[in-house]
Amino acid sequence: MGQMVEDRFIRKALFTKITKNEQIDYKFNSKVTEHKKQSGYISVTLDNGKKLNTKLLVGADGRNSELANRAEIKKSGWKYNQSALVCAIEHEADHNGVAWQYFMPSGPLAVLPMTGKRSCIVWTEQNANAKAINLFDETRYTKILAARLGNFLGKFKIIGDRHTYPLELSIADRFIDERLALIGDAAHSVHPIAGQGLNAGFKDIAVLAHIIQDAHHRGEDLGSLGVLKRYEEWRRFDSAQLAYSTDLFNKLFSNENEALRLARNIGLKLLDSIPVAKRNIIKEAAGITGELPRLMH
């Protein structure tokens, strides 16, 4: 279905690529404080006072995107009464490269394999519980996690920092403005139950690159609304479909109604017995269905 890749490895690979490309001028620890549309370009002011001019500005500044706010791009959606508790563990048993997900009344608990005998835990709890658990010392936190996790990985200990963040669903009403394109969490934020937030962001990048390349070959203005509209039409419906599908799954699997639980179990067993349907769902979850941009072939 896919591979788990640690964030640090992705960052290192990207950094290696951009530092070897002389056509990329990169700036760290810089923030856009202002952007203004001009005739034929967009002017960007950084927090150090430096000004840059570009044909196209790409907003990848997260779900609280200041670029989107300044462009008056509103979002639709809602906050869940859930937060994700995230940590890494080192364990006795081998995970064999297999990811696990447990569905509990408070929300899913995912065990995602990392290198060696290590796994990443993404553990969903109601907001009040998550806030309390996050304040516990490591011994008590580990004890609560062990009660939910069971012993299939043997004894374990938490390594590194623990994090928590509130969960929400949001879709930007527009993914574009003149000379501005939103990607990733700046455009859409989904429940982590399907583990597709990062993949959706990568697909945004691949589609935008595809559109820009085609426009360049045609001699078109890369930041024009006509060009950027193609990106929005390709990605917005797909992103909304993913967001609402994950919302439905969260409601379905975080509900302990007996009739619903029985129907859910029957449905999963039926799906497991139909290989074609199972393969199609795996492809859908991996984001490799429908029209794919060149970078994803």
Question: What label would you give each PLM region?
Answer:
Residues 1-70, 78-83:
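Conserved N-terminal helical subregion
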Residues 56-164:
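Conserved FAD-binding catalytic core of PHBH/FMO-like flavoproteins
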Residues 210-297:
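C-terminal helical "tail/cap" subdomain of flavin- and related membrane-associated enzymes
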Residues 129-225:
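FAD/FMN-dependent oxidoreductases across multiple families
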Residues 7-11, 15, 82, 86, ...:
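A general structural signal for well-ordered alpha-helical segments in protein cores
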Residues 38, 105, 115, 176-177:
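Structural motif
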Residues 3-8, 135, 202, 257:
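Short, solvent-exposed loop/helix junctions and linker helices
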Residues 15-19, 100, 142, 146, ...:
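Solvent-exposed, non-membrane alpha-helical residues enriched in polar/charged side chains
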